[in-house]
């Protein structure tokens, strides 16, 4: 059996997943695109050593920052982990905020064309608005389902259309199949989520995100996209103050969470799990247990 737990950054899904895994004697499989990097546990908000001691975690801190990573590689490796978990007679809990990675694990691998380095190089010279306009002209329906402000998704969807010669709907037909298991999405009021994100940004700065960034060697193109990495490097070069850096980190995280909420609204199969400031991770996990009939 596989369970899925989603939610925007800062919603508390990792803590809920740990509580739920303890209750079910389950193991956690991350669907986060950046927690795979060993050298970035603070910036990626990877599970703490204490949480990893409580519950087995997979797909966390498995590769160096010099290595590129993508959703297809993640899918194949995570699926092997899930097969091994099931072979031990245990439940797998998939959680993480990277939409495509999560979607592949819940609904299967898309047959879309692989990444095209030449196209990506050409995209680098274009604005997000220009890329989205081109996607709209080639595949209006696909563009309508694409977040125009999310450059990563705009680039990938345009890449699929150009390299594959077919609209997005053709490649995503496999996603019409039922999910591999039940899923929940943690939802919080936006002001509360924004406050949690502000505390998270402050905590990252206090707990070593600056030192973590300063100690990095060369990074792959994928690792370079880690949220906050460019901001802290700018601070280290003296271009912005520490206070400004923390504020911009919180802002960038809020913007990312907004994009995640937009994507999650389209995932109608996920059951809503409303959360308030008074709800502990354990209380939220207990509500999932009740819905599972435990």
Curated annotation (Swiss-Prot):
What keywords are annotated for this sequence in UniProt?
Answer: ATP-binding, Magnesium, Nucleotide-binding, Transferase, tRNA processing
- Residues bound to ATP are 7-14
User: What Pfam families does the entry give?
Assistant: IPPT (PF01715)
What are the residue positions of the site described as Interaction with substrate tRNA? Answer: 98
For this entry, list what GO says about its biological process.
tRNA modification
Residues that, per the record, bind substrate: 9-14
The record's listing under Gene3D superfamilies reads:
1.10.20.140, Crystal structure of tRNA isopentenylpyrophosphate transferase (bh2366) domain (1.10.287.890), P-loop containing nucleotide triphosphate hydrolases (3.40.50.300)
Q: How does it assemble?
A: Monomer.
The molecule here is called tRNA dimethylallyltransferase
The organism named in the record is Akkermansia muciniphila (strain ATCC BAA-835 / DSM 22959 / JCM 33894 / BCRC 81048 / CCUG 64013 / CIP 107961 / Muc)
Q: Which gene encodes it?
A: miaA
């Amino acid at each position: 059996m596989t369970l899925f737990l989603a939610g925007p950054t800062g919603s508390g899904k990792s803590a809920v997943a740990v509580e739920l895994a303890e209750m079910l004697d389950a193991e956690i499989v991350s669907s986060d695109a950046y927690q795979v990097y060993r050298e970035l546990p603070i910036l990626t908000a990877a599970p703490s050593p204490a949480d990893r001691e409580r519950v087995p975690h997979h797909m966390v801190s498995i590769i160096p920052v010099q290595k590129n990573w993508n959703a297809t590689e993640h899918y194949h490796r995570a699926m092997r982990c899930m097969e091994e978990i099931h072979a031990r007679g245990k439940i797998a809990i998939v959680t993480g905020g990277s939409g495509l990675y999560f979607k592949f694990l819940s609904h299967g691998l898309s047959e879309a064309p692989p990444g095209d380095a030449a196209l990506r190089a050409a995209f680098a010279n274009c604005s997000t608005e220009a890329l989205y306009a081109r996607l709209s002209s080639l595949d209006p329906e696909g563009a309508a389902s694409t977040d125009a402000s999310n450059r990563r998704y705009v680039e990938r969807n345009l890449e699929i259309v150009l390299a594959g010669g077919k609209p997005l709907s053709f490649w995503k037909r496999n996603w019409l199949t039922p999910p591999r298991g039940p899923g929940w999405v943690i939802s919080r009021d936006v002001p509360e989520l924004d406050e949690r994100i502000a505390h998270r940004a402050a905590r990252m700065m206090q707990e070593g995100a600056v030192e973590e960034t300063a100690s990095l060697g060369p990074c792959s193109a994928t690792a370079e996209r880690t949220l906050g990495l460019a901001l802290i490097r700018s601070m280290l070069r003296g271009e912005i103050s520490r206070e400004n850096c923390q504020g911009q980190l919180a802002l960038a995280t809020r913007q990312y969470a907004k994009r995640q909420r937009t994507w999650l609204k389209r995932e109608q199969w996920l059951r809503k799990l409303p959360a308030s400031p008074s709800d502990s991770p354990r209380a939220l996990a207990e509500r999932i247990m009740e819905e599972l009939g435990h």
